[in-house]
Amino acid sequence: MTTGQDALYTNSTLALNPQTGQVEWYFQHVPGETLDLDIVYERVLIDADGEQWLFTIGKDGILWKLDRRTGAFVDLRETIYQDVFETVDQTTGRLEYRQDIRDAGVGSRVAACPSLLGGHNWQASAYHPDAGALVIPLHQACMYLTGRDVEFVEGGGGTAGRWELREMPGTNGNV
């Protein structure tokens, strides 16, 4: 898989009909994700001003806003410094990796923010309706990631990538 391939339904939000199990709609946040910056955490459902929204945030630190009735992209916000996407289309929500990430191969060392620990990770977000506040735990660190050969054997698993934490710009030495 490359960053140019979709790998359908990975890093996606899916709405399933509970009676039939059929997919009602889906939105793929990051097609071809390759840096372990997946969008796999909670979906927060918010009703406000007569609208029904779905918010989610993943390891890339991008907060997504979708129409929860249709799955249509509404908006996104970068909540922390990120430099893995050279294109962040505010109209369509389409992201494009930097060229050096798209070209990286086994043995290539890539600098990336945030790290694979994630801008957001397993600590759940929460919505406070009285305050109108969405509270999101964030992690601010960057990484160097080097791809290594992987021997595919039954029961093996893992990517075998080597990664090192590094300081995120603007964090004043705090990792």
Question: What do the PLM-derived regions correspond to, one by one?
Answer:
Residues 1-2, 12, 37-58, 121-126, ...:
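Repeat-blade elements of multi-bladed beta-propeller folds
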Residues 2-39, 46-51, 62-112, 142-175:
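Extracytoplasmic/lumenal domain signature
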Residues 93, 100, 108-111, 117-143:
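Long, low-complexity segments enriched in small/aliphatic residues
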